[in-house]
Amino acid sequence: RETEISSAGDFYVHDVAGYSIAVVRTERGDIHAYPNACLHRGRQLKSGSSAGLGKSRDITCPFHGFRWSLDGSFQGAPCEWDFPHIDRSNFDLPALRVDTWGGWVFVNIDGTAPPLHEYLGIMVDHFERWAPEKTYKALHIKKVLRCNWKIANEAFIESYHTAATHPQLLPYTGDSNSQYDCFNDYVSRTITPMGVVSPHVRGTTEEQAVHQWLTVYGVDAEEGLPELPAGKSAREFLGDMNIRRFSKMYDQDLSSFATHSEVLDAILYSVFPNFAPWAGFRPNVTYRFLPYNDSPDMCTMEIMLMMRYPESQARPRDATEQFVPADQTLGDTPGIEAGLAAEHERSEGQAPRHDMEHRHDREHAVG
C-alpha cells in the first residue's frame, strides 16, 4: 500500500518468481522501483523485515558499499578511482515502471505493457464511488498453500463451488444466482447476492435466512433475532440494516446513495494475473496469489481486510503481515492439483457461465 511507504526512505522488497524488486519513497515523495541488485556484483541492495518493509536514507550495497540516492542516481563507491570505466552519468539504478491505483502500488517489469489505468479499464470508474484509497489495512494474512497459484486464484473468483464446499452458506447466499462479467482482456467480476436463499435449498424461509445471516456474522447482538416485517424480503431487511450499521461505523449517511448490493453482496473483481479486490461499502477483502519459491506446486495466498474509517478521525495504521495455517476454505486445493496432474485431456465438463472467467484467465495466461 502507498501508506506503508509514506515517508522518504521507506522501502518495500518484493520477491516473486525469481525477481527481487525494491520499491522506495524518494525525498520528493515519489515512488520509485528498481531491480533489487547492485550494478557492481549483483548483491541484493535491500532486505526488509519479514513483511518486506524497511527504512533507509539511501540505497547502499551491503557488500562493497556502492551507493545510490533514493531517486536512483549514483552517489559513489569506495576507491572509486579504481573504476575509471564507470560513467557516473550512466550508472543510475534502472527504474521499473510504477503506478498507483486505489492506494495500491503496482510495479511492472515489462516495458511494453499498457499503462496501468488502461489495463484496469472500466474498473477504475467502478471503484471511484467506493474510494479504496481511503481505506486502511486492518488485517493481513499470508498462507503457504500446496497448490499452483493459478489454482488457488481460480478457487476464489467463482461461487459455483459453494454448494459442495461451503453448504453452510446456502441458507443466505444466492450462489447459483451469481452474475459473471468479463470487461476486457484482464478484468472480470463476480457478484454473488447475499440475503437470499440458494436455489439449492428447500424449506428455508426468508425469516430463517435473516436469522442465519445475523448468527453467522454476529451482527448487533443487542437487536436480537428480529421478526421479518410483513411484505419485506430478507434481502431488503439486511440491506437496510447494513446501511444503518455502516453509516454509523463510517460517520457518513449512506442511505441516500448506497444500494443494498453495495452493502450486502460479495462483489469481487479479478485483475489478471493475481490481484482480486472486493468492492462496495462493506469492509472488504483483497486477495493476492503468488508463486512460492521455485515450486510450481506451491504458492502463497494473501488476504487483506480493507476497512473504512470516519474522515473526522486519524487514519489507523496498516496491519503487519501475519502467517497462519490454512483453513477449510482452502482444504480442497491439493486435491485439485493432483486431479489436474492426472488428466490426460481437458474434459468437456465445463459450465458455460460459471467457468467463463476461468477460460478468460487461461487464454491470457498462454496468450
Question: Where are the language model's segments positioned?
Answer:
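Extracytoplasmic c-type cytochrome modules immediately beyond a signal peptide or single-pass transmembrane anchor
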Residues: 1-2
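Rieske [2Fe-2S] iron-sulfur-binding domain
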Residues: 5-111, 115-126
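C-terminal catalytic domain of Rieske-type non-heme iron oxygenases
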Residues: 30, 99, 104, 108-367
